[in-house]
Amino acid sequence: MSLAAPKSIKPKDWQSRGNPQNLLGHSIFVVDEGPANAPVILLLHGFPTSSWDWNLIWESLKKDYRLIALDMLGFGFSDKPNRRDYSIHQQADIVEALIKKYQLKEFHVLAHDYGDTVAQELLSRQIEENGAGYWLSCCFLNGGLFPETHRALLTQKL
């Protein structure tokens, strides 16, 4: 028995599946697919990529879940302001604005790499009871979970 590899789609085809949303004054690209009444998975991409990273698992997951993925500020099809420092706190603020705009009450979080760090900030807000929505679960993939041991690449520091 062999398993066929998932079929990848081209970034321009991925772009046609999403829409820009005005979040905190920025145009943020968002893909929202799957059954409207299904459990929600919020997907946070890594560095230096975009929501397109999720395309290989998208079709399989969207059969049973409503999937919402955004391109964070400065990435993918979202705004890339010049002369701008991108902070984890700002990215978390944008994700929370999305959660509020989409009126997400509860959801799962799937985060990768840079998205892990953003998710950690969001999780901290949850613990302090001032975060948006309610997390059902969280999965961190390949990120710097422990700041004291994380060694960012030179390109991540620039």
What residue ranges belong to the model's regions?
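A short, Lys/Arg-enriched amphipathic alpha-helix followed by its capping loop at the start of a domain
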Residues: 56-65, 101
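Flexible "cap/lid" subdomain of the alpha/beta-hydrolase fold that forms the substrate-access gate
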Residues: 2-35, 40, 48, 68, ...
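The serine-hydrolase catalytic nucleophile loop
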Residues: 47-58
